[in-house]
């Protein structure tokens, strides 16, 4: 079968024929899925460029099938799945040892030995066919097939927001005087795909949301943010004027994955009882906090929390939110898929795996 393959840690990518795993169907409990489309994300590009040093092929192999975002159609079903149903595979798999993994929550793996499709020890989904355990498959409603590929990155954000709201249960009451979160203010740093998805989820929960970047918004970004009333702030000159206008924030999310020093810029912007969520992976620099800021952190019950992968419940929640956005913000939903490429256009596929388009939210590779 055809697949998109890398040889980590070396840079480069190719589309080639690989051995089909159809003999796996002789193993009781697997479902055969024909892949219809894949999403491309920043992780894929880091692997292709050779910058993601933690990437590991499956044991005994020197090649890795790329990709952790996919939608497919069931060809050989069973175990609760019917032929013709649309499904999405879950990318993170358990270590088989710790309790969290054994109960279906490898996002909290305690051994560090879990597998990640297309990244760590497990072939990914950029291939014609997949033979998978049904517990790692999520059913996709046909009505949202056009944007359902976003459910994988969105699942990570659903888990992140869940973690934040759970952490705020430490406070007797964090809702507003009308029982909602409408009075709570959130700042999302970064207007890339992750930042935009975070902003949309937070608006869905009722937060007032500001999104920041050190450049002006591109036209398509403006169109996406306008309908849900997400406010933009240009942070090129710092955040002083923003705090002056709107006061401090109950929640701040860093999605930039750039300089670690941004953390010390954001900490002073937190409201009492506030949360700073770190989602992006800083690539350089360092940060330090003055002892007075640390004291202030303790006295005012502020926290910093690391945010990571979602699991099956979060994929299901992501699909619910995607369906709701098509009704709540139809114009926004229609702008989320930036480009669609055929797997037969090899040159364009390789180019898209190497470079991100300006203002890109999601590029899809289709296999039909």
Swiss-Prot record:
**CDD domains named in the record:** glucose_DH
Cofactor entry: Zn(2+)
Protein EC: 1.1.1.47
Residues given in the record as Zn(2+) 1 binding sites: 41, 68-69, 152
Q: Which gene encodes it?
A: gdh2
Can you state which reaction this protein catalyses? D-glucose + NAD(+) = D-glucono-1,5-lactone + NADH + H(+); D-glucose + NADP(+) = D-glucono-1,5-lactone + NADPH + H(+)
Q: What is this protein called?
A: Glucose 1-dehydrogenase 2
Write the record's keywords in alphabetical order, separated by commas.
Carbohydrate metabolism, Metal-binding, NAD, NADP, Nucleotide-binding, Oxidoreductase, Zinc
Q: Name one GO molecular function term.
A: NAD+ binding
Binding residues for NADP(+): 213-215, 279-281, 307-309, 356
Kindly indicate where the leader peptide sits in this chain. Answer: none
